[in-house]
Amino acid sequence: MKQIIKIVSSPKIFVYTIIWLMVLVVLGTLAQRDIGLYASQQKYFSANITWLGGIIPVPGGRITMIIMLVNLTFMVLFKQNLWKIKKIGVLIMHIGALLLLIGGGLTAIFSSEGNMVIEEGAQSNRVDDYHDTELTIINTSNENLDKYTVFDQPILGKGNILSHENLNFNIEIISYLRNCEPLKRTAPAGIHYKGMLKNFMLRSLRPEKENSRNRPGITYRITNSESSSDGIYGLFLGQSVPQTAVINNQNYEFIIRRKRTYLPFAIELLDFKKVMHSGTGIAKSYSSEVNLIENGIPRRVLIEMNEPLRHKGYTFFQSSFIEGPEGEATVLAAVKNYGRSFPYISSIIMSIGLLLHLLKSIPKLLKKNLRVAD
């Protein structure tokens, strides 16, 4: 057991993981030019395993950070020479680095990014995710109440069977396309194709470098409906007419959309202002005067380009705006980051540790200088 602890807590592991992270940063930075920021993050930093050249498997950013976290934890807990008064500064620096890694893990696993679009005079409590989508099935049989069943993107993989107590049928995912476009068929489709796929097919496209510009789509098969609705259907993001089906005398709508998060508070846009560059149609700055409404109580807040609104773990940035025939609408970037405070706290802790270590070393340096002078 002691030998295992000695190996796992070795400082060499920390050095090797730092070097490998530097390699991943270089590879990820270079890859952004070809595949875009989001795809590069997913391939090199969010992945457990990264495939170099599509052939050689190497540790991805997530595994590397886990190894570093375990190594630092064992160093703090089991390195006997760290738990001495003369090493207090080094110990505090290690604890600060450990907190920084924990914060990074929380951010990587639980953080989310999206936007909130609000027209002047309207309010919203909904954030649409930038990256993730969801399959939404709406039972519209009851005129007074729509019943929603939502499946998140991670379970929309090829071959997955979706079922739910609200649904009296099953859905088999045939394919999930990161980016696609509808293409009109040049020949009649088979009788097993239903809805949009009778006249169109979904053609896979190369993913855009900017992930938010991709148009995901799925093809799926409805089974066990015990009706003529059994067959293959298709959906894509931004589809103007939702896919409908009547199954066992129940009316359903099928939609693929950006993943939605509903907040325990709402934001009402009172006034949107923009300042233009002189003689141009380019906006110099813009801001949103809003009401933050929680429990029926409004609080007036001004959101500007460099002054976001922070509330209950969410940060709302003034991102852009939309001008339409019915007026202006603000676009707020909404970020949920559970590890937001960790970099500040860990930086302070590491600074204190470094300062203590330097102060502890001053007497030795002075004695050494005096000996040299003598």
Residue map of PLM features:
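Short, Lys/Arg-rich N-terminal segment immediately upstream of the first membrane anchor
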Residues: M1-P11, W51-I56, W83
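Alpha-helical transmembrane segments and their helix-start/interface "positive-inside/aromatic belt" motifs
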Residues: K2-W20, G89-A97
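Hydrophobic alpha-helical transmembrane segments
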Residues: K6-F14, I35-A47, S285-I303
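Membrane-embedded alpha-helical segments of integral membrane proteins
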Residues: V15-F78
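Internal alpha-helical transmembrane segments
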Residues: I56-E143, V331, V335-K367
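Soluble non-transmembrane domains of integral membrane proteins
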Residues: G114-N337
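Cytoplasmic C-terminal tails of single-pass
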Residues: K367-D374
